[in-house]
């Protein structure tokens, strides 16, 4: 197997296959669940709006892939600084049956100099999650500056985040290798690689993109680190490219680019 094919197979099994569009329907989510089951293995998870969790759970069970995790989003996509609403949404997501919650960090508050609200929001959302995985989206493409990206990453980790995630996919600039490096370096420098993972989201579209991101993680945190409890790709159009790279052709087309 070529290096690119090996990276494509690895990336496929680390995907949070995503649809977070205003026109999502039960039918689209059912199709997403079908796409998560491929001839070369399943994606790690699907990522959907909370209201679709019951139909997704049913579909994954019926197609024999109950191990595919269901991630959902809260405080999404704007990252407001209302802790009460973020926590209420997170509790509702857990009640719906989410396996993982991707919450948006109040990044604009941090840009305005408020570090406390972000810490408290993440801390309380993690308390609401209990053992359920909490990924925190810091919106790197809006923070832009290295100091802010690293500060947001540190705050999330100190507050109990299980993963730090680049982006919502809803702003002009989403994951970039530069932003990924900054966040991975925080995980390394804080000595939390055993318990904190990383998720680039939005803009990872090809096997070559995925291979470069994985090579960076291997370089910074070691070649064994990026397993499915420490690394995810938030993407949709990536899956088709990975399957094409792996020469798998009988897969349904997946949702709009993320």
From Swiss-Prot:
GO terms for molecular function: deoxyribose-phosphate aldolase activity. Keywords: Cytoplasm, Lyase, Schiff base. It holds the Pfam family DeoC. Signal peptide: none annotated. The active site is at residues 102, 165, 199. It comes from the Bacteria. SMART domains: DeoC (SM01133). The keyword Cell cycle does not apply. It is found in: Cytoplasm. GO terms for cellular component: cytoplasm. CDD domains: DeoC (cd00959). Its EC number is 4.1.2.4. Gene3D superfamilies: Aldolase class I (3.20.20.70). It catalyses: 2-deoxy-D-ribose 5-phosphate = D-glyceraldehyde 3-phosphate + acetaldehyde. Pathway: Carbohydrate degradation; 2-deoxy-D-ribose 1-phosphate degradation; D-glyceraldehyde 3-phosphate and acetaldehyde from 2-deoxy-alpha-D-ribose 1-phosphate: step 2/2. GO terms for biological process: 2-deoxyribose 1-phosphate catabolic process; carbohydrate catabolic process; deoxyribonucleotide catabolic process. InterPro entries: Aldolase_TIM, DeoC, DeoC/FbaB/LacD_aldolase, DeoC_typeII. Belongs to the DeoC/FbaB aldolase family. DeoC type 2 subfamily. Catalyzes a reversible aldol reaction between acetaldehyde and D-glyceraldehyde 3-phosphate to generate 2-deoxy-D-ribose 5-phosphate. This is Deoxyribose-phosphate aldolase 2. It comes from Vibrio vulnificus (strain YJ016). The lineage of its organism: Bacteria, Pseudomonadati, Pseudomonadota, Gammaproteobacteria, Vibrionales. The gene is deoC2.
């Amino acid at each position: 197997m070529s290096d690119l094919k090996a990276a494509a197979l690895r990336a496929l099994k680390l995907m949070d296959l995503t649809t977070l569009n205003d026109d999502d329907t039960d039918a689209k989510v059912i199709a997403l669940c079908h796409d998560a089951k491929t001839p070369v293995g399943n994606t790690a998870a699907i990522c959907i709006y909370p209201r679709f969790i019951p139909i997704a759970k049913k579909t994954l069970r019926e197609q024999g892939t109950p191990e595919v995790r269901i991630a959902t989003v809260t405080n999404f996509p704007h990252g407001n600084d209302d802790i009460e609403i973020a926590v209420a949404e997170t509790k509702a997501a857990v009640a719906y049956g989410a396996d993982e919650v991707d919450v948006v960090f109040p990044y604009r508050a941090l840009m305005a100099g408020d570090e406390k609200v972000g810490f408290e929001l993440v801390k309380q959302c993690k308390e609401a999650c209990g053992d359920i995985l909490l990924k925190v989206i810091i919106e790197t493409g809006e923070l832009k500056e290295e100091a802010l990206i690293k500060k947001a990453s540190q705050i999330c980790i100190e507050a109990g985040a299980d993963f730090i995630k680049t982006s919502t996919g809803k702003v002009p600039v989403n994951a970039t290798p530069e932003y990924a490096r900054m966040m991975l370096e925080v995980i390394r420098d804080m000595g939390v690689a055993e318990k904190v993972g990383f998720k680039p989201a939005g803009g990872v579209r090809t096997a070559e993109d995925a291979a470069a991101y994985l090579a960076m993680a291997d370089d910074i945190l070691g070649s064994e680190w990026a397993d499915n409890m420490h690394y995810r790709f938030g993407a949709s159009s990536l899956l088709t490219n990975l399957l094409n790279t792996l020469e798998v052709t009988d897969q349904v087309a997946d949702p709009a680019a993320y």
